[in-house]
Structure formats: structure tokens, C-alpha cells
């Protein structure tokens, strides 16, 4: 088999049809999977010796949340080191990173694997991976044909990365190349709430405004603060952290503003406070709502005039500090109750950000679960950690009052429990490994029997059409996987789909 001009043109067209980068990447992966008839495909971005999935097809959804460190994935390391197409033999001793992550094939090992490194000039920027369940699945495609595919994908990814850098309005170091940007915090999530939050972070990071980050406990407010700092012009200077809830009243002023020798009993030397440490950088005040009214007044002065006074010192020191504050309280209610100063609230909340709770983030819970599974795999030296269908269903229907922090602890605990019930270095997390309070899973509703308005043939075709649509959706539009699920020959399925108007 060889690629026709029409096939390559179709791939190029799909790369232009998407509205955003994510849509274009997904179209590319879906089209490649159809053209190459593979069971799974993925587009990965290379960053700091790890591959980050950008788009997948035929793989479990939690793959999008995983971060594949080269040290833990020898096949991906081989792809990163190669300058050309990499074909792994079916009997390769190198474990495949997607073993157990192809829906419906969890118990089988991937047999055919091709890796295409993607370059912008001499810089590795990503990779395309193609996987199949048959050993000789990709033998019909020449290296030259696969290089054409890699060139198209590399061009799309290179343009996307360049546009991303321009849109971020961040200046690179003077000697940096376009693909050597300062590493920034990765915030995992594709839900509308997280997409909006990422846009707002990008907007406010380029400014010097104070930011008030609100959200429930465990939602990741500190991660938001870190992302703002790392995407700001202050990124080369320190981000200093202070938990106001853990600050004893007796030393709170000293912690914030510092003290001079002899200022109080135990002050045996001069000491800089958090504001001095954060000069020209960023100060993150976590749980700002826990500060006393007296300290709030002193903090307000710093925000107004930009100077601090060490405890026991009459002199004022000028500081240039951006303040990011976080709280799990409703500070408006605290102001009305007289527990928080209104003037300080308005100074801090120049640009308010709200971090959505995990229960409102939809499928993000699965992406995050994949991220934590990969972390556990690396830390505990396991060959793979995967979620069963039952575990995924449970995670999607639990409310997570402790949010992302609770999910992280639940995954780590489940891995420990799962390891105790089976030998070997492969772990499959089942629903029973999660010690959640009772979760009511939805039961399929029995549809009312419709009034017959079709003849038998029309009703049969309508049933076949809907069954095929559902099977395609469950298998990410992979016709081969769909045929296996429906227990029919793939060629017969294609013919039936054409007759039913599901294919051109």
C-alpha cells in the first residue's frame, strides 16, 4: 500500500479545518488512525525529558493526563534519541507505554509499534506513536511514507508551539531558541471551567496585578499561583510561599516583614521577612482569610505604598513584590461579618480567579487519575498502573469533597491495596480498591416501547445504524475495534455502514 496524493491532501486539509490547536491535533490523529488502520495513535509533545500527550485516538482517556518520563519508558526514550522512523519488533523486550491502555484490549500486549520523532530544525518537539494488535500491521507502509506523515505533523506542532509562545506575551531569554522556553507548570484538565481558568491565568500573568485565588480546599490554588508566577515577567525571580493559617500570632509580623537584632527575646540577629525575600518576585499568601485584623492593616500599607518596616526598626524598606493570595472562604461574607477588611479585599482582588471544584470538571477526573497513576508507577518501580472500566466509572460518579488532593491520595492508596492482592509489577486498579463512601452509580433506564411507525426492514436498519454509531463512539471511531466489539468481519461492517448511510 502507498499513500496517494489524495490521502496526503486530506491530512493537510484536516490540519487546517480545526478551530483551535487541540481540534487540529485531534483531527490529525483521527485521520491517521483511519488511513493507517491502526488500533491506537497519539501525538505527544516533548518537554524536559518527558512526552506529554496532546491528542489520542483508540487509547483510554486517562492517557491524556499521563506524563511519560523517558527514564521510565525505554521505547519513548528510543524514539526521542532516534532521528528517523523507529519500528519496534513484535518480540521487543522494551515494554510498550500503552500496554493495558487500549479500551477492550486491556489484557493484551501491543504487538506493532511505530514511533515518529518530530523536529523543528534540530530540536525535538514531539512524537507520533502508532500501535496495533497485529505483529505485521504497519509493514505495508514504507519509511518514506511515514516520514511524510511525520513532516506534516511536525509542521502543525511547530506552528502551534510558536503561536502559543506569541500569544503568551512572554519574553524568552536572549539566547533561547523558540523551543527552549522556560518550563512552566502544567495544569491538567480540558473541561470548560479549566480551559477558562487557563485563559485567565495567561491574561493576568503578563500583568503585575494582585490576584485573589478562591476555591475549595484541595482544588489546586497553589498550583494556580505557581502557574501565574512562571508565566510572568517575574519568573526569573523567587516565588515565596507563606501559609497564613499556620502563622502563630506572636511571630506573624516578623515572618511577613522581618526583624532586627534585639527586637524581642530570641531575636539574636537581623532577619529578612517574606516580603524582602520576594523582592522583585512574587509572594503567595495562602489562606489569607486567616490573618488577624491587625496584620491585615499592616499588609494593606505594604500594598498601598510598597514599603515595609522590620520589627524593632524605625526605617522603611522599599520592596517590589507582586502579591497572589488564596482562600477557601467567601471573603465578601467575611467583610460583611467584620472579619476581613474591605479595603484589603479590594486591594487583593484586582483580578479574582476561581478554581472549579473537581465535581464540576467532568472527565478531568480521569485525566488527573491517569497523571497520578503514572506518578505511582514511577515511584514504586511498577511496569504499569491502569484503571479498570469499573474504577473509571466509580471515579466519574464520586463527588470528591476533598477535590484533587483527595483523588491523589485515593489513587496512591488504591495502588498499595492492589499490589497487596496480586504478584508482579503490573497493577490494575479496580473499584473495590477505592475506599469511598457509598456511591450510587447510575442504572440504565429502560426505554419505553415506542409506537411502531416503521416496517420491519426500516426498524431493523434503524437499530443497526444506532448500534454501529454507539460502537464507533465507544471505540473512538476505530472500525477494526468496532468490528471486534460487534463480532463481525470488518469488511462486512464497512459494507453495511455504507448501505446504512454511515460512510461515503
UniProtKB/Swiss-Prot annotation:
Keywords: ATP-binding, DNA-binding, Nucleotide-binding, Phosphoprotein, Transcription, Transcription regulation. Residues 1-186 are annotated as: NO sensor or transducer. Residues 187-416 form the Sigma-54 factor interaction domain. SMART domains: AAA, GAF. It comes from the Bacteria. One of its GO terms (biological process) is positive regulation of DNA-templated transcription. SUPFAM superfamilies: GAF domain-like, Homeodomain-like, P-loop containing nucleoside triphosphate hydrolases. Pathway: Nitrogen metabolism; nitric oxide reduction. GO terms for cellular component: protein-DNA complex. Residues 479-498 bind DNA. PROSITE patterns: SIGMA54_INTERACT_1, SIGMA54_INTERACT_2, SIGMA54_INTERACT_3, SIGMA54_INTERACT_4. ATP binds at residues 215-222, 278-287. Deletion of amino acids 30-164 allows induction of NO reductase activity even in the absence of NO, i.e. the need for an NO-induced signal has been bypassed. This is Anaerobic nitric oxide reductase transcription regulator NorR. It comes from Escherichia coli (strain K12). The gene is norR.
